[in-house]
């Protein structure tokens, strides 16, 4: 097994319902260590740049509007096979299709308001971590 870093973003629906701690408990109980975390409001420009790979998709504008509708919590997670492990504990994108006991099944409200974003590959993790965090913000 390989120790990896991955990126996670707790979405506005979770923040508004005061469930940040609950999400962190899922992550930590799965064996992931939170090595960086900060809360912020994304600007429209930041959201557009972050989700640039989806720019041509029909849901892009709605996604940007949603993710800028409230605060988000940005995180760097560390652990054995952290990218895959985080994807498993998050659950399927659509909460209605997610397995019981996953973050999205238990806390997600819709495909868009599905509680959490997580990197889907090593390249995505590197890009997404670098987008929001400097090396000095990641505490080992």
From Swiss-Prot:
Homotetramer. Keywords: ATP-binding, Cytoplasm, Kinase, Magnesium, Metal-binding, Nucleotide metabolism, Nucleotide-binding, Phosphoprotein, Transferase. It is found in: Cytoplasm. GO terms for biological process: CTP biosynthetic process; GTP biosynthetic process; UTP biosynthetic process. This is Nucleoside diphosphate kinase. It holds the Pfam family NDK. It catalyses: a 2'-deoxyribonucleoside 5'-diphosphate + ATP = a 2'-deoxyribonucleoside 5'-triphosphate + ADP; a ribonucleoside 5'-diphosphate + ATP = a ribonucleoside 5'-triphosphate + ADP. The lineage of its organism: Bacteria, Pseudomonadati, Pseudomonadota, Alphaproteobacteria, Rickettsiales. GO terms for cellular component: cytoplasm.
């Amino acid at each position: 097994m390989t120790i990896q870093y991955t990126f996670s973003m707790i979405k506005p629906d979770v923040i508004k319902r005061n469930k940040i701690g609950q999400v962190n408990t899922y992550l930590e109980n799965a064996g992931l260590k939170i090595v960086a975390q900060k809360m912020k409001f994304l600007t429209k420009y930041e959201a557009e740049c972050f989700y640039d790979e989806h720019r041509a998709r029909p849901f892009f504008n709605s996604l940007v509007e949603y993710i800028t509708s409230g605060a988000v919590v940005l995180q760097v997670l560390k652990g054995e096979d952290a990218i895959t492990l985080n994807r498993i504990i998050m659950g399927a994108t659509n909460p209605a299709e997610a397995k019981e006991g996953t973050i999205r099944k238990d806390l997600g409200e819709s495909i868009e308001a599905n509680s959490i974003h997580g990197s889907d590959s090593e390249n995505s993790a590197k890009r997404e971590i670098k987008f929001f965090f400097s090396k000095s913000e990641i505490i080992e």
